[in-house]
Regions:
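Active-site and adjacent substrate-binding regions of carbohydrate-active enzymes
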Residues: 1-551
């Protein structure tokens, strides 16, 4: 294994959801100038790159993941000039820019789709059309947002496929003209100085051409990691990603280790790295998201071990707890009360000790929590609103559903970034597009920066350590307590260096008896005021975590 990593192999990436980051116009919606305004803060944190979720022209049915024009910026967010300034200002601080590419589908407002409504247009073949009867779709596949994955178009008397909202029509990747257009989009942004791309649900781009009924499920096995997915990504990589030096991270929906070993192979023939979500389903009993359930920490550790060991020396992992589709991790796996700070630090220390590229989602670095919404009118997310309506229809209790949304909704991570204890948490001078978290007076950036023992400084140190200690980049992964539901203990080794991580996942004190620990250890990180200089028998406090290093 080489000692000279790609920048992303010992770097850390910060995800920005621009809509909720910083508003500079008083519109109540964040914008690109808001990102520029906060670059100094991101530089202080020490991140290597920022990934921006979509800011393209969009009807905003799915918060910008329904793109109507891939090369134009939605006026809500600013202009191309603003974007160019953002690139320049970020690069002057050593921060790279990663853009989100939504290439599985477009908005039905996209010019291609409008043309495609005419059966004679060449753009008809840009989408997936099938025959059927008005009441009988081509097959029984389900949309990920509920209902059938097919929408009838009366004028042309055919159905089009939409794996997500009906306003998000799936592109037909079998058509070389589609792939050529998408390559042009990548070139457009590479020309403007973009360093990387995050590819939305990119393992869904190849569908089984037979479009069979799924007798045992919702259809996903016929389009997830589909027959030509690797071939298509190989072509995109050969023609655009590698020639333009773009880092790529694929968001992989319901994928497998075996596929990701190919997508993110260290040979670099498809993508640089992959996101998978298996570890964020350990509180989905029986695979069911819309329930209230405690996380299964043994399952969580088993999944991390599977991916850490399976990808080691084969392919590259992306590491994350949070994004714009997930609830806040400290609320989910930690504590919102008296132990919020140690819990947030512990979760950071467990993740950032692993192999891969860590991603931090805005607000995670100050320990932001779920907002505790209590009314359905507080929500904006299409998935949450659809599920509430669908499950109410099935006779489920409204209060129960609201409790589930308060813990599982995607809106939990979409509330405005908490900058200060001032009006609207310093996010906007106007009316915010979605309500604020109810604790922004206590939990905000200003307070975090003023407190040397805040969660922020733990993240800052973890980011710096990643560049200093090669064992973090290249080391293997050994789970030393795989069956403990309360302690997470792992070891990483590389060329005579050893990192030992111990964490208490519970709010109770826990005894820990390490095996024989020879040699000299150095205390590197801890989340309470003091910790043992050496790994030895000890009682771990609630959510306590410690890193020791041996060279």
């Amino acid at each position: 294994m080489t000692n000279l990593p790609h920048w992303w192999q010992n770097g850390v990436i910060y995800q920005i959801y621009p809509k909720s980051f910083q508003d500079t116009t008083g519109s109540g919606t964040g914008d690109l100038r808001g990102v520029i305004q906060r670059l100094g803060y991101l530089h202080k944190l020490g991140v290597d790159a920022i990934w921006l979720t979509p800011f393209y022209v969009s009807p905003q049915v799915d918060n910008g993941y329904d793109v109507a024009n891939y090369t134009a910026i939605d006026p809500t967010y600013g202009t191309l000039d603003d974007f160019d300034e953002l690139v320049t200002q970020a690069k002057s601080r050593g921060i790279r820019i990663i853009l989100d590419m939504v290439f599985n589908h477009t908005s039905t407002q996209h010019a291609w789709f409008r043309e495609a409504l005419n059966k004679a247009s060449p753009y008809r073949q840009f989408y997936i059309w099938r025959d059927g009867e008005p009441e009988t779709p081509p097959n029984n596949w389900r949309s990920k947002f509920g209902g059938s994955a097919w929408r009838w178009h009366a004028e042309s008397e055919q159905y089009y496929l939409h794996l997500f909202a009906p306003e998000q029509a799936d592109l037909n990747w079998e058509n070389p003209a589609v792939r050529a257009e998408l390559k042009k989009v990548c070139e457009f942004w590479a020309d403007r100085g973009v360093d990387g791309l995050r590819l939305d649900v990119v393992n869904l781009i190849s569908k089984d051409p037979r479009f069979p009924d799924d007798l045992d499920g919702d259809g996903r096995r016929f389009y997830t990691d589909g027959p030509r997915a690797h071939e298509f990504l190989h072509e995109m990589n050969r023609d655009v990603f590698t020639p333009r030096g773009l880092m790529t991270v694929g968001e992989m929906s319901s994928t497998s280790l075996e596929h990701c070993q190919r997508y993110a192979a260290l040979t670099g023939s498809e993508l640089s790295m992959t996101f998978n979500f298996h570890h964020l389903k350990v509180d989905y009993p029986g695979g069911e998201k819309w329930t209230l359930a405690k996380p299964d920490f043994v399952a969580l550790k088993t999944l991390f071990r599977h991916w850490q060991q399976g990808m080691h020396n084969v392919a590259w992992n992306a590491l994350f707890w949070c994004n714009h589709d997930q609830p806040r991790i400290v609320s989910r796996f930690g504590d919102e009360g008296e132990y919020r700070v140690p819990a947030a630090k512990m979760l950071a220390m467990v993740l950032h000790g692993m192999q891969g590229t860590p991603y931090i989602y805005q607000g995670e670095e100050i320990g932001m929590t779920n907002p505790h919404f209590t009314r359905i009118t507080d929500y904006r997310d299409v998935e949450s609103l659809n599920m509430f309506a669908e499950l109410r229809n099935d006779g489920r209790d409204a209060d129960e559903l609201l409790a589930i949304l308060a813990s599982k909704s995607r809106d939990n991570s979409r509330t405005p970034m908490q900058w200060s204890n001032g009006d609207n948490a310093g996010f906007t001078a106007g009316e915010p597009w979605i309500g604020l978290g109810d604790n922004y007076q206590e939990i905000n950036v200003e307070a975090a920066l003023a407190d040397e023992s805040s969660v922020f400084y733990t993240y800052q140190k973890l980011i710096a350590l990643r560049k200093q200690e090669a064992v973090l980049t290249w080391g293997d992964y050994q789970d030393l307590l795989p069956n403990s539901p309360v302690l997470w203990c792992y070891r990483r080794e590389w060329k005579g260096q050893t990192l030992l991580v111990i964490a208490n996942l519970s709010r109770e004190i826990q005894p820990w008896q390490p095996g024989q620990m020879r040699g000299n250890w150095q205390l590197v990180m801890h989340n309470y005021e003091e910790a043992s200089p050496q790994p030895c028998a000890m009682t771990l406090r609630p959510f306590e975590a410690v890193w020791w290093l041996q060279k």
